[in-house]
Amino acid sequence: MAVPTTRKDLMIVNMGPHHPSMHGVLRLIVTLDGEDVIDCEPIVGYLHRGMEKIAENRTIIQYLPYVTRWDYLATMFTEAITVNGPEQLGNIQVPKRASYIRVIMLELSRIASHLLWLGPFMADIGAQTPFFYILRERELIYDLFEAATGMRMMHNYFRIGGVAADLPYGWIDKCLDFCDYFLIGLTEYQKLITRNPIFLERVENVGIIGGEEAINWGLSGPMLRASGIQWDLRKVDHYECYDEFDWEVQWQKEGDSLARYLIRIGEMAESVKIIQQALEGIPGGPYENLEIRRFNRIKYPEWNDFEYRFISKKPSPAFELSKQELYVRVEAPKGELGIFLIGDQSVFPWRWKIRPPGFINLQILPQLVKKMKLADIMTILGSIDIIMGEVDR
């Protein structure tokens, strides 16, 4: 009878691109020595769609419905960054009411994104129950989005100079009711998760990043603030009307997966504070700067013909991008979402470079998982919070 021999060589394991814990089509080539991770190589690009090149062959109005496919769980932020660039290039003023509506929608989108991070993150480390609680609250946010924009996801709500439509009758009261209800739900999550000994065993002192290390890697968002760096673009860049509200930047100094969890929980509570203040203080006035609608004002007689009205293509309003370059950024749920925009006196951008937070934050994954256990890969990857739509673009 043959005696089984023990192999001592390293083992290479492919995780993904179809693994449920990969949060999209991410592939990890993991080198293992037993349960210990020796090396990890992320392979990205499976969801690449050429979004930057598409932007350079479209007007901003034509491109706007497509940008929601970058980070498809926080679509308001991709719309915000797409209209902020042309607004700054053209010195277009946004009415105060429109700015308040934008802030409300952005913070609701931040809560929805953090909720859909928290549910799968808990499922990855073995806790299924919170996932169902979290979807309950997230559906309420999507109900609010549907009432205001007509769409539960991929809203196409932001416009250059404002938003597409004003808030419907009764929406503000409905949103205030949601805020009160959600704060109770958030307390439930914390009771269920934060002091759970099994949860703490999986996340405490796992995936530690120091402050200087986080800056050197170019990390942003909760990944940066969990390492003791108090950097939030809503406070730093003073965009929209965030300065008019009373709220605190959430940060921790431990730098581990638990710190990143605590920051996102804290950010949801702060987002509710911002939304409540904005709803109670929202001013009257227009929801869009109508003066910047530049339609072709020449009227042609064939415009009333049957063929034109029902068959021909109508030109969309075009905004000429002045000949200069500009970098604009917003504080998205996953970090700094930026656009480097170059105009050349054309309605098309000459260059449209996307700076996705998930792609930059993912760079540090191989360093974090080395010398850890195989099971810790799921914890660390989940705490980074990536969406492959924005990683691959």
UniProtKB/Swiss-Prot annotation:
GO terms for cellular component: chloroplast thylakoid membrane. It comes from the Eukaryota. GO terms for biological process: photosynthesis, light reaction. It catalyses: a plastoquinone + NADH + (n+1) H(+)(in) = a plastoquinol + NAD(+) + n H(+)(out); a plastoquinone + NADPH + (n+1) H(+)(in) = a plastoquinol + NADP(+) + n H(+)(out). The keyword NAD applies. One of its GO terms (molecular function) is NAD binding. It is a peripheral membrane protein. The keyword NADP applies. Its EC number is 7.1.1.-. It is found in: Plastid, Chloroplast thylakoid membrane. Keywords: Chloroplast, Membrane, NAD, NADP, Plastid, Plastoquinone, Quinone, Thylakoid, Translocase, Transport. NDH is composed of at least 16 different subunits, 5 of which are encoded in the nucleus. Belongs to the complex I 49 kDa subunit family. NDH shuttles electrons from NAD(P)H:plastoquinone, via FMN and iron-sulfur (Fe-S) centers, to quinones in the photosynthetic chain and possibly in a chloroplast respiratory chain. The immediate electron acceptor for the enzyme in this species is believed to be plastoquinone. Couples the redox reaction to proton translocation, and thus conserves the redox energy in a proton gradient. PANTHER family: NADH DEHYDROGENASE [UBIQUINONE] IRON-SULFUR PROTEIN 2, MITOCHONDRIAL, NADH-UBIQUINONE OXIDOREDUCTASE 49 KDA SUBUNIT. This is NAD(P)H-quinone oxidoreductase subunit H, chloroplastic. It comes from Spinacia oleracea (Spinach).
